[in-house]
């Protein structure tokens, strides 16, 4: 269930169907839906050049402790990949200095209304196909292992790979399509 928009919070504009969009690599939403959606991936480097996250890494880690949030912790061990489901205690969340872990939180847009604004850029997708905003945070060498999703995924990466922290000057790539 979506949270009501907070007073003073402005909705960003959803893209017009026939207007080229920078984050789609100059394609219009109609062209993207016709030529790429559920057909082939599209990689757009620097898709959101002015992107400033409204949700911090600390916010995401705090959500992992919230029993309303669907959260997972993936660790790579010598024996392979280990998956743990939240909510987690503060002690269960790895420190920034440890490596080979990733935390994923689903439905962030329903728990933090400011995160819902980011989804406006994707509102040209049929509402039945636009589910939620999932945010992940990873330590150095973190990941979730090879996998196939049973749903469509838009990946937006606003931090440096493997660093787990935002680094100024990096433009996030955007990968869209079947994943």
Locations of regions flagged by a protein language model:
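Non-catalytic, conserved peripheral segments adjacent to functional cores
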Residues: 38-40
């Amino acid at each position: 269930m979506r949270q009501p928009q907070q007073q003073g919070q402005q909705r960003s504009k959803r893209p017009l169907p026939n207007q080229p969009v920078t984050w789609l690599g100059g394609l219009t939403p109609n062209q993207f839906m016709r030529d790429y959606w559920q057909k082939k991936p599209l990689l757009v480097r620097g898709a959101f050049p002015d992107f400033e996250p409204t949700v911090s890494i600390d916010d995401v880690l705090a959500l992992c402790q919230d029993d309303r949030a669907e959260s997972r912790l993936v660790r790579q061990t010598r024996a392979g990949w280990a998956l743990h489901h939240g909510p987690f205690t503060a002690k269960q969340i790895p420190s920034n200095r440890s490596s080979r872990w990733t935390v994923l939180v689903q439905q962030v847009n329903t728990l933090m209304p400011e995160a819902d604004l980011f989804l406006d850029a994707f509102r040209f997708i049929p509402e039945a196909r636009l589910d939620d905003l999932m945010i992940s945070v990873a330590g150095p060498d973190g990941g979730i292992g090879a996998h196939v999703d049973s749903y469509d995924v838009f990946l937006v990466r606003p931090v440096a790979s493997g660093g787990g922290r935002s680094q100024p000057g990096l433009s996030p790539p955007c990968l869209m399509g079947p994943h």
